Amino acid sequence: MTLTKNSASRMRTWQEEADMLLSLLDCFVPEREAVFASSEFFTGKRFYDLCLENEARTPEELEKKLGPEYKISVLAKNKEQGRSFARKLRELGHKIVLTPVVFNVSALNDGRNWSGSEYMVFWDLIIANKCHAIYLNEFWQFSDSCVFHYIAGLRTGKKLLDHAGNSVVLDSARKMVTSAIRRLEDYGFDVFNLHDALTVLKTFSSVG
């Protein structure tokens, strides 16, 4: 069978691609039977530590300092850390564990990648429809995506747990994110995404 490639007629919108991927997941992931393994990828403790070591304060500055090593030192190591976290959860008995760090749309779509916000909305849909719990890897409060995964779980009533399986209640989450923001800003980082996330967290009423 010959596969047709680079056909303009096959270009899909983000919504069409998201619906297609959700439909694929329906084949083997029943509703709300998965756990979501949230782990840092683009931003997080590893990224900020490397920035401090290399006198950088943005991804662009760090990539300029490290060159090709940037993808290995940050993205590749974070991907492996995320995979390891998911494996740990499976070893604890969770049959279906979904981790976002290995997902890459551009590899499947002729190099046309999604935007960061499109990835985030897609994972929000996955969390809402496929997961009953979210596990947050260690130092999650320093990662933009992890904090927004927490918010997605909060909105949809999921169990919210840290890497050791302890419940992460709203008041604790607010304090952790606030502390992370203060620490990073003390070092000169502009963490507007974490500020946005904290603003959202403050709109929820504390329960438990």
Region roles according to the model:
Residues 1-208:
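Conserved catalytic or regulatory cores that recognize and/or transform ribose-phosphate-containing ligands
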